[in-house]
Amino acid sequence: FREAMKDSVIRYGEDIDFKEECWERFAKSLYYRPGNAREASYYSSLDEDLKEIGKRHGSDSRNIFYLSTPPSLYLPIIENLNSSGLAVKRRSDEPAWPRVVVEKPFGHDLKSALVLDEKIHAVLNEHQVYRIDHYLGKETVQNIMCFRFANSIFEPLWNNNYIDHVQITNAETLGVEERGAYYEEAGALKDMIQNHLMQLVALVAMEPPNSLSAEATRDERTKVLKAVRRFDPNKVDSYAVRGQYDAGYVLGNEAIRYRDEEKVASDSNTETFAALKLEIDNWRWAGVPFYIRSGKRLEKRITEIAVHFKAPPHKLFSNMANTGLRSIMADSSPNVLVMKIQPDQGISLKFATKQPGPTTQLRALTMDFKYGTAFGDHTPSAYERLILDSLIGDPSLFARSDFVETSWSLLTPVIEHWPAVSPETKSASDNSIVQGPFPNYEAGSWGPEASNTLIGSTGHSWRIL
């Protein structure tokens, strides 16, 4: 086991200065205990092993149980940890030991998430539960709060007086790979939007917390989701779009259609692309639509947040007849702030400037900040940061139960509507968007045409990436 771990560190550790003597010292603390997670007897022997290991290394029993398992095992593991004495419920004013780290998905809908929370809270207090969302551990995502609240030049503009709309894109070139069975149950909405992209929406739209404490920051993130306008179940197709990839070419390589993937039904209506229009009903964001989209087998791998600012109220240069100027003025968002999450982490700001010459011609330019250039190529991975935070007991970058439940509640109308209605069916709503039949977008494209219709209904268009 230790040799396998060593090989993995050498193989996957980015820019690590591997020292054999350091590894040998560290490896003495690595142990492997196989067993059946559903059998109570396994936990009794695990308890004995942990006590023995603690004595051997002179440490007390402060345990973190990381549930990187199928979701169906979450409850059996937690209940067995409790019955064996390995998991003890602590008061909120007591140290949060032991701790349990839970991977997504946390439930598959609102009802299942509530049941899971109820069962877990019967065994552990909320401050002992760490629901991991690796997007919150990404450096660029963590930088959103710093960018907004540590720089006075941006926050005064961060409202509906100056911002026209916000686009959040998560695009993947990969298909479902070996996860066909899982993806059939999840789809793009549950796999990406319910957790990762909702966290991005919250970070962009949240109010300044009164401190950087875990509770203060998580309170503000949850308030955003509670302010998102609830979707009319009868008008789902006017604010939510779904798609499924067909065969095509991605980055020059041939790709099969989703329905031909392993462990995927030949008539599957599971979405591999989803796009939503959100409205946040509060003083800061009223009238500013948030467009979010996530899809597989798209043209390019990229995740970004694009904040589109409004055009100046008086188009001073609009009557000057030159090609360069007209191209700038035709853009409804001459200023766009882009926070690039992956693969190239950074921030860019697009603005108009005068092109050198005897006449006044405007040209769009971009100022770029790149993490690799400023801080070196290696930045800690999301999981490095999150695992460290779970060790030191800082839950700031973990999802709290009320956030998870609010997110599921918000998406419930879509979750219930899509399986009940085939993609090609046009709903009775006047503004409904025809989306099918599946498959409705070619692998290597930017998704179904319906997503352009969704954002185009308010005069906007997706950024060219």
What positions do the PLM features span?
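Secretory/organelle targeting and membrane-embedding segments
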Residues: 1-102, 106-465
